[in-house]
Curated annotation (Swiss-Prot):
Signal peptide annotation: 1-20
Gene for this chain: E3
Lipid bilayer topology: Single-pass membrane protein
InterPro entries hit by this protein: Sushi/SCR/CCP_sf, Sushi_SCR_CCP_dom
PROSITE patterns named in the record: SUSHI
Name used for this protein in its record: SUSHI domain-containing protein E3
This protein's record includes keyword Nuclease: no
Protein species of origin: Equine herpesvirus 2 (strain 86/87) (EHV-2)
UniProt keyword terms in alphabetical order: Disulfide bond, Host membrane, Membrane, Signal, Sushi, Transmembrane, Transmembrane helix
Length: 174
């Protein structure tokens, strides 16, 4: 079943001069050339939706019915070529039936006999030995609170420097 399309494809050309051949909108003239699109065939076991945005394009989008898979492009657009007239960008897709096969696994109704015998007593079972890790000692170069002597010396120097700057530049505070 084919549907007659009542819309037109448009070729829009901007004329004008610009840097490196780019069109200049202020000096451009709009030339509108339209041709009727040919009828686009419908697809078997699928649907198509027609989209038209005023003057830029006409587009069909396709999807397949449940149980079918789309083979080909999911859309096609009508465009105008000066030498060829209007053409659709892609050929019609097709909807191919999905091959869903299920494999039944054989089931067994037989039962496995229970093994009788002796099993180890959980109370008397030996467990792997755990090795205790001795805590590591602080390196010798760290002091009581975990700081190196250089960190404490640097901190004292910074405090003395700040006190000297305050007293020198701002005068005695007392």
């Amino acid at each position: 079943m084919a549907t007659e399309v009542q819309f037109a494809c448009a070729l829009v050309v901007l004329l004008g001069c610009g840097y490196a051949g780019t069109p200049t909108p202020s000096k451009s003239t709009l030339i509108y050339n339209s041709q009727n699109c040919t009828t686009y065939p419908s697809i078997e076991n699928g649907q198509s939706s027609l989209y038209y945005n005023g003057s830029w394009f006409i587009r069909y989008e396709f999807n397949c019915s449940s149980g079918y898979e789309l083979q080909g492009w999911p859309y096609t657009t009508c465009i105008f070529w000066p030498k060829n007239g209007t053409i659709w960008t892609n050929g019609p897709p097709s909807c191919v039936k999905l091959n869903i096969t299920t494999t039944l696994m054989p089931t067994s109704t037989s039962t496995t006999p229970v093994t009788t015998g002796t099993f180890p007593d959980p109370q008397n079972t030996t467990h792997p030995t755990h090795h205790t890790v001795k805590p590591t000692r602080r390196p010798i170069n760290l002091l009581r609170f975990g700081y190196t002597p250089w960190a404490i010396i640097t901190l004292v120097v910074i405090i003395l420097l700040v006190v000297w700057i305050v007293n020198c530049c701002m005068g005695p505070m007392f």
